[in-house]
Amino acid sequence: MRVLGIETSCDETGIAIYDDEKGLLANQLYSQVKLHADYGGVVPELASRDHVRKTVPLIQAALKESGLTAKDIDAVAYTAGPGLVGALLVGATIGRSLAFAWDVPAIPVHHMEGHLLAPMLEENPPEFPFVALLVSGGHTQLISVTGIGEYELLGESIDDAAGEAFDKTAKLLGLDYPGGPMLSKLASQGVEKRFVFPRPMTDRPGLDFSFSGLKTFAANTIRNNENDDQTRADIARAFEDAVVDTLMIKCKRALDQTGFTRLVMAGGVSANRTLRTRLEEMMQKRRGEVFYARPEFCTDNGAMIAYAGMVRVKGGATADLSVSVRPRWPLAELPAA
């Protein structure tokens, strides 16, 4: 079975074709980073218009890359949410239309389930059960995963997501968009413990997160210190260390609570090298395992949507011809497969 995946939830247009026997056959991606850079963040209307321009040409490119034609596609999977409503509608409309024209199923995919399953694309995929840490610009969640669609929310951010806090703090430091990767690069030049930031909500029980106060702390630290390059790097280092420590402490608690020995990290922030290193060290001490996707599959991409669509089709998922998206869509509402 071959599934075409379409990802248009935010500022990346991702198209991929996944074969259940041969694996990934094609992967096309167009990033809108340059389009939004002058605005310091994603402009929804511009994102939607660019998806309209890029989606069909990328589908054609994916078919060419794989050496396939429309007749070889058995299902079309598209991101139906969560995300920007206009951007989602572009992918949903094109996905439904192609599925109708090709007489194949159209499968709506949950964007965060796509991220959660992205490590399954690697040579050493995780086995169930595991704790999933989903960290991106819009989400910071800890999930107990016992099977496809068997998701229990253990904790989440009550305000800013980790990725959002990275981007906002990067902006305070005068860094270009996208800020998260730029802040991490700057932090690598910083001196450890020159500044010490709080570890939010780690002094109390529970698995929820809060990062808005950390952003405010960073703003005050920036305002009260010199604006030289080394000071900015030291502040970036302190901020990154605080976020990574907080995520690690909560992961420990989630693993203790569930008794699981496997940790899956997914979402854009999971590409952060410091976070990967610290979680690897933690899981080695616990004699457990940590799994994550290669960096290009941590950020938004069509491969994870094609794979998630494949899993759902095999689980018996069906859909009618209506075009519907859900900008807000709790992961726990997904059915088991």
Swiss-Prot record:
GO terms for biological process: tRNA threonylcarbamoyladenosine modification. InterPro entries: ATPase_NBD, Gcp-like_dom, KAE1/TsaD, Peptidase_M22_CS, TsaD. Keywords: Acyltransferase, Cytoplasm, Iron, Metal-binding, Transferase, tRNA processing. Substrate binds at residues 134-138, 167, 180, 272. Binds 1 Fe(2+) ion per subunit. Its cofactor is Fe(2+). Its EC number is 2.3.1.234. It catalyses: L-threonylcarbamoyladenylate + adenosine(37) in tRNA = N(6)-L-threonylcarbamoyladenosine(37) in tRNA + AMP + H(+). It is an enzyme of class 2 (transferase). GO terms for molecular function: iron ion binding; N(6)-L-threonylcarbamoyladenine synthase activity. Pfam families: TsaD. It is found in: Cytoplasm. One of its GO terms (cellular component) is cytoplasm. Fe cation binds at residues 111, 115, 300. The keyword tRNA processing applies. The keyword Transferase applies. It comes from the Bacteria. Required for the formation of a threonylcarbamoyl group on adenosine at position 37 (t(6)A37) in tRNAs that read codons beginning with adenine. Is involved in the transfer of the threonylcarbamoyl moiety of threonylcarbamoyl-AMP (TC-AMP) to the N6 group of A37, together with TsaE and TsaB. TsaD likely plays a direct catalytic role in this reaction. PANTHER family: TRNA N6-ADENOSINE THREONYLCARBAMOYLTRANSFERASE, TRNA N6-ADENOSINE THREONYLCARBAMOYLTRANSFERASE, MITOCHONDRIAL. Belongs to the KAE1 / TsaD family. This is tRNA N6-adenosine threonylcarbamoyltransferase. It comes from Enterobacter sp. (strain 638).
